[in-house]
Regions:
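Domain-level signal for soluble alpha/beta catalytic cores
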Residues: 1-186
């Protein structure tokens, strides 16, 4: 639909201002697909005066729904008056796809921290409900690969439960940092 830049800024500003009044320290923007939407949020967050982090959701082709690539986002965030303190990817279609995107961010040579928040598996419709098929063990492996791919902020998105997060923490604590993985390994 049609949404003007000014209205998008106003909408993000209203939410960010309320969060600031509520005492938050950092604003978090995620699951964005359009660069215009990301820019409107950046402008609104500048008005509020709080640091922020932002992520986009990338598909199996390494692009957002609106065609943004990891290289595009890495360049885009550096153009804002107040860039995010960290940026990256969330959601998407599975660990291998988000890890490929993280490798794309790292390949740009960014010094800004990279975020990776992958889904716990692939969504399936089962008995009238959405169910994610990822078990905690693969999420632990994902966390290690995300770290080794260059992510500094690692978490989970859709379908991620406390057991997944525990396994991720356990894997990160128990396994030494490794070399940057190849696409074949991912």
């Amino acid at each position: 639909g049609e949404l003007s830049h000014a209205l998008a800024v106003e909408m993000f500003h209203e939410q960010a201002d309320a969060l600031k009044e509520g005492g938050v320290d950092v604003l978090w923007l995620e699951t964005i697909s359009a660069p215009e939407e990301f820019a409107a949020a950046a402008e609104a967050f500048k008005l509020v005066g709080l640091p922020w982090c932002g992520t986009m959701s990338f598909d199996t082709a390494g692009r957002t729904m609106m065609g943004v690539t990891s290289a595009d986002l890495a360049k885009l965030v550096e153009d804002y008056d107040v860039p995010p303190v960290a940026f990256g990817a969330n959601c998407g279609t599975g660990a291998s796809d988000i890890l490929r995107t993280v490798l794309g961010f790292a390949a740009q040579g960014t010094e800004r921290p990279i975020i990776s928040k992958g889904n716990a598996g692939i969504p399936k419709y089962v008995d009238g409900h959405i169910h994610y098929d990822g078990t905690p063990e693969p999420m632990g492996e994902y966390a290690v690969l995300a770290r080794d791919s260059g992510a500094k902020i690692i978490g989970g998105c859709c379908g991620t439960m406390p057991d997944h997060l525990r396994k991720m923490r356990e894997a990160l604590d128990s396994r030494p940092r490794g070399e940057r993985p190849t696409l074949e390994r991912i």
